Amino acid sequence: MKKNVLGLVVGLLGLLTVACNPQPEGVQSFDMQKIAGRYADTETGMKQSDIFKKNVLYVSPEDGSKGVVIWEKGDKPVWSQGNYLVFELYGEAQYSGVINIEFYKDMKNFVAEKIVLQGGETSGTDKDMPWISCLMGVLPQLKTQVVFPLSYLDAQQLFVPRSPRQLKGTVSGNRLAPEDIIKVVLRFGPYDGSNYRASYELASVSITDSLPDPYPAISTPVIDRLGQWKDKEWPGKLKDEEDMIRQNQAIAKEIENVGYPSEWGRFGGWKKKQFKGTGFFRTQHDGTRWWLVDPDGYAFLSVGIDCIGPNSSGPVNGMEDLFEWLPENGNATYAEAVKDRRGFKTVDFYIANMIRVYGQDWRSQWDKLTENLMKKIRFNTVGNWSDIDFARKSRIPYVLPLRDFPGTAVSLYRDFPDVFSDEYLQNAKAFARQLADYKDDPYMVGYFLRNEPQWAFGYHNLAYEMFATRQASHTKDEFINWLEKKYQGDITVVNKKWNLKLKDFASLKDCTFKEYPSDVANDDFYEFSTIMVKMYVDIPCDEVVKIDKNHMNLGMRYAWLSSDLLYKAGERFDVFSINGYGLVPPPTSEIAERSGKPVMIGEFHQGAVDRALPATGIIGVLNQQERAAAYRNYIEQGFARPELVGMHYFQWIDQPYYGRFDGENYNIGVVTTCNIPYPELTEAMTTTNERIYDVATGKVEAYSADIPKTPAIHY
């Protein structure tokens, strides 16, 4: 989820202008009657629509697994004769729509692989699973043209560009040539039979050469002057600007003299347990459990919040009609709330609201208020993606996300670089130099090398993926050399084991594979993939320690442990970090056993749709009371484990209703975009955060709650 490579921001901000024309040139329409005719149930069929003013396919499946087959092999149109899959959609519910576009291939030569999903579930590929899919979101109760660029079937990019009213789109799976598609399914959600039941109107499906034109503007805006959703009421919704100012001022006054508990040291460590202080954070195992040790020597468990900074912006191009008010470019009062990024306008209602509350001195007031609120809620760490100026000024321990992890001009698969090239080494040296400004700061807990490598989203055999194209690379050359040494220069043995007819090892350079030539080839590719990952990790780890010997290497914040390859890096980190979404932390004991290192959770959250926003985030609960219980359950069950030394909640501020840069619009904040804390959540956070050391040492029993499983609304 989360804020993946920041360099993607501008590309994702480029909202694609879309719309519908009756049947212009370059549009191949699907047969909607044929699609509808595949279904016998009464919940799916063609009906007259008041929204689209024509017959549409009405979809309200009786269970969450039923999908709409929009194309099967032999149908028209042809996937290779267009650039975009476009479908017109309207979701009737008062929460975001979730659609999964699933592309299937012929699996007759299928090789089974293990897959671990971001929510922590383990599954396996089988012949009934899509080969590649894209999970997409749409705003509720708005006609939307959903656009999927067919170029993304190569699986090299995870996040599709947004179009108006279309939210985030995330690709998962393996590359697929258009001519190999045998079936395409649209699967709608969320669904659980009681609280959530998907209900949609599907007006058209087509393959197009170019992006369609926009819909006409709506007559009634859906977002008010404060950035709030107009069409829904909820407890705590602000009436107007005066209400917002009054509540913010009352909160600031209530917490102006707050501090940490007396048994906490200046860094937030626990005075009741002391080790040797070194002036910087470090790790220690006391014979029973792992600890961080703060610079003064006190035992320290990191309980933090990600994305602490005064921002919650999103792009508005092509969606101006959704807003009751937008600050204009050049408006001096709200200049800091409006950004022009390469011609695309982004608006931040959170900053606009802080300007309304505090005037032009809003930033210094925000710094003071936020520091006090963090201490009031008993957070002792400023988490990833946060404003570093705020972190250093607040004198609260912080973690540092390093920028610009080394890449190369040639990418082997997604963002995996050519690790055997000298270019990778030189870029790693430049990457490490940014630590020079932080190496003497005792408040820095440590640094993350990067966040959620895209090559690690799902199970992928990296060496095999290199051979999807004839692209030359130093790593491919090294693989061929390695293979020749492994088989002692005997190409006949390779030909027999791989089912090939190569004349020599060098001719492997010109080979491409859509499928594994044999099980032995699969194993050989995987064996070399472990070498690739070792190089990927070792080279930057060698360089950062040359610049900064004082601080901990906190790892790469893997999105989840999608394959065995990710364990290989653990020995180079001081702390092994993963992002773990669930009602409890993901399994961590095996990580500690295999890496010999303690574990830190870089991100987790739980969200609901009972208040300000129409999506829950990666883990959903029914309401704010259950968000509170879920936080307590996650943190206390986590710190009861001897290997966990830190957990950071994602994130400080709610995301904007209209979607951040990539389209996420989740109710996951500690505070709203009007800077009002969620009382149920913050009270629970305060209670649990004060107990972490007693829970970790077994003095009190960890809080436990039976939280009902709820479909997550995320994309």
Language-model regions, residue ranges each:
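Short carbohydrate-recognition loop motifs
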Residues: 46-67
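Extracellular ligand-binding interfaces
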Residues: 60-172, 195-198
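Active-site-adjacent substrate/metal-binding segments within catalytic domains
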Residues: 236-392, 409-440, 513-518, 523-532
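Polysaccharide-binding and catalytic clefts of secreted carbohydrate-active enzymes
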Residues: 295, 305-306, 313, 319-360, ...
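Active-site clefts of carbohydrate-active enzymes
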Residues: 346-354, 409-417, 511-526, 559, ...
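Aromatic-rich peripheral "rim/lid" segments of glycoside hydrolase catalytic domains that contact
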Residues: 463-478, 650-715
